[in-house]
């Protein structure tokens, strides 16, 4: 037996330190909810997790972007519902005026209603706004709006939505004439062309909205799957970690007990000297 070096105590202290460190990590993981709290815990796992988080953030913002685009489309399409309704009324009035049975006074009344309708069409186009944009009267004629609907810097993730000027002047129904049957026939043709133009634009917006709704669904599913994968890499499995904590706590207590007994061993030398 030697007393200069207590190998048993040194060994017990080393194991005590190991168990203390392990227990501290268990507590950190349980309290934070993450099994990777620093690069030293899992360098590769942390890098993969951060890449996934970047992608998740991009996907979630892309969902917001797509929903904004849907909101703009719904705003524009809703306004054009009224434009369509007024154009249909214009069609009725011009068809009515094409009949030769109306007096000048009656035609004047029809003209007055047509003028009121064209002013309202222009007002709606001018005042329809979404987040500062006026899709039915863009600042620059027929300038598309671009929406970014993906998580990566790829041009395929950029989607454009056309903006069309839907004022009465642009639709060429701002000065419909019904003073005689010939003028009324010409006005009917102008109204028909305007109805077709509005119908075409509404169809384009409807197709874009359908695409965006599918895009939102796909983005949400992708985000959900990547979030689940990232969670498996980074989040603490509470059941496993509690089991490890219990084991390390028992080992720590055992190491403390063994260290105490190891430190008492040299005392046996004193009994030999008595």
Language-model-detected regions and their locations in the chain:
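Primary detection of the long, small/polar-rich alpha-helical "axial" segments characteristic
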Residues: 1-274
């Amino acid at each position: 037996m030697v007393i200069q070096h207590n190998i048993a105590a040194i060994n017990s202290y080393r194991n005590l330190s190991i168990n203390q460190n392990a227990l501290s990590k268990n507590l950190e993981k349980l309290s934070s909810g993450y099994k990777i709290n620093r690069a030293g815990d899992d360098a590769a796992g942390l890098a993969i997790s951060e890449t996934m988080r970047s992608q998740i953030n991009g996907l979630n913002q892309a969902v917001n972007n797509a929903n904004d685009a849907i909101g703009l489309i719904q705003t524009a399409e809703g306004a054009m519902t009224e434009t369509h309704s007024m154009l249909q009324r214009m069609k009725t009035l011009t068809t009515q005026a094409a009949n030769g049975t109306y007096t000048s006074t009656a035609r004047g009344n029809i003209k007055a209603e047509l003028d009121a309708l064209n002013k309202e069409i222009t007002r709606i186009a001018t005042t329809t706004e979404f987040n500062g944009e006026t899709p039915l009267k863009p600042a620059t004629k027929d300038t598309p709006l671009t929406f970014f609907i993906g998580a990566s810097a790829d041009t395929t993730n950029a989607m454009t939505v056309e903006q069309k000027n839907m004022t009465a002047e642009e639709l060429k129904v701002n000065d419909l004439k019904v003073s005689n049957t010939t003028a009324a026939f010409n006005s009917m043709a102008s109204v028909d062309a305007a109805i077709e133009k509005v119908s075409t634009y509404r169809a384009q917006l409807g197709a874009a909205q359908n695409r965006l709704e599918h895009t939102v669904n796909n983005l949400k599913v992708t985000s959900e799957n990547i979030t689940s994968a990232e969670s498996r890499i980074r989040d603490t499995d509470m059941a496993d970690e509690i089991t490890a904590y219990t084991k390390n706590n028992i080992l720590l207590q055992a190491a403390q007990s063994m260290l105490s007994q190891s430190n008492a061993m040299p005392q046996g030398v004193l009994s030999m000297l008595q």
